[in-house]
Amino acid sequence: MQPLQLSHKGFKAYDIRGVVGAEVNEDLAYRVGRAYAALYHPQAMCVGYDIRPSSPAIAKAVMRGLTDGGADVMDIGLCGTEMMYFATFHYGLSGGIMITASHNPSNYNGLKLVREGGIPVSADTGLKDIEALAFSGDFPEAERKGKTFARQILQDYIDCILSFVDGTKMKPLHIVADAGNGCANIAFAELKKHLPFTFTELYMEPDGSFPHGVPNPMLEECQKPLKEKVLEEKADLGIAWDGDFDRCFFIDENGKFVEGCYMVGLLASYFLKRHPGEIIIHDPRVFWNTEKICRLYGGVPVESKGGHAFMKETMRRVHGIYGAENSAHHFFRDFSYCDSGMIPWLIVTELMSETGRHLGEMVAEMEKEFPVSGEINLPAKNVEKTLAAVKAAYAPKALAIDPTDGVGLEFENWRFNLRPSNTEPLIRFNMETMGDRSLLEEKKDEIMKLVEESNR
């Protein structure tokens, strides 16, 4: 084939994602399929896709590339990313490809690639090789042409997800669920049949034009309808998912967004109470609460660089039972170390049923003991210069310096992490203190001002 004339901007650290036409198209998808087949020689793959208008055609193109490269392909159709992970490890396939751009606007699309067992193909583990071969078009001739076959995986997937909780403990709850017009209702509609809950549903209809805004519950404007509905309905809990439902977000009974670090601590306590001594993986952003939970219940906290590929690699290496990023990615050993947006809320409802306490009550002490800033995105023209300026100002007085991801500095009763975004000219800022909200505000403003000044 001729070399591909297309921007390379779609190739990110963990996946391929970009504007349809300019950065991602059917030609690229076909070539990625061919390159994957040429480099890894898979026997059988699965391919799934999300609800974006461009997804079915891109999925067909990548399947054609895989079969032309000699691989058989299981077409699992419209699904969430974790369903692609599930199909890969549950059916013993050589790998999988998901067509999705997660929470990005509808004019974006992308490809998420995994090997056997759901192991990610990222820039450090083969994605750059796939990029080079896809753009060169220098594919070897396959010895045979692969075949495509369709398979319905939903029921097997649902059975797996339900196995993470004890259904006999579930008690009636009123829950508001918001799918943001993404894929979540594919799984949610089937899961709810097995649960004794009353649901009020928001934006469940899959619609890749995202008429109610991008499906990104990290954004306050996306949380607003869910918060209002929880209060209006006097519901027990609010849950929301991003576009491909590999992330799950929580609104408590008071209509308040629960920061990811407290959800990590809560789920860590769930696993450690049942499996004392196990290993819990956390990212470098804010983790004092998670460390305390581990000490309390006899667990072992292990830090990993942020990003799903790094988290999964660390979990596999140390055999962690559970891991999470504060960005709402939750990873489970018994889900082949992959992330799921459905397992977390089932665990939370089991905890609520078991204890008779609402989510807000369960995290209140954590919020008081370890207040956090939440993740703040700060523009940075020169990321390295900005990080160096902050480090020069604060490192001399730090009790500990953590180079795991960006700049992490720890002091007597506060700490912060600044790390570059993998995809945008931004620095992501997170901070926590030991019970001191006024110190949190003081130091947060101080550091944000320094970042702003270093960009002038």
Label the model's feature ranges.
Residues 1-64, 68-70, 148-173:
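An N-terminal, well-structured beta->alpha segment
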Residues 44-50, 74, 174-176, 278-284, ...:
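Short glycine-rich phosphate-binding loop at a beta-alpha junction
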Residues 45-109, 162, 191-251:
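N-terminal small/polar loop signature for handling phosphorylated ligands or for N-terminal nucleophile
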Residues 94-102, 108, 230-252, 257, ...:
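Glycine-rich phosphate-binding loop
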Residues 107-131, 251-266, 335-346, 352:
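A short, gly/pro- and small-residue-rich
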Residues 109-233:
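Gly/Ser/Thr-enriched, mixed-charge loops and adjacent short helices
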Residues 127-159, 163, 253-326, 330-332:
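Proline/glycine-rich low-complexity loops and linkers
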Residues 275-456:
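Phosphate-binding and adjacent anionic-ligand microenvironments
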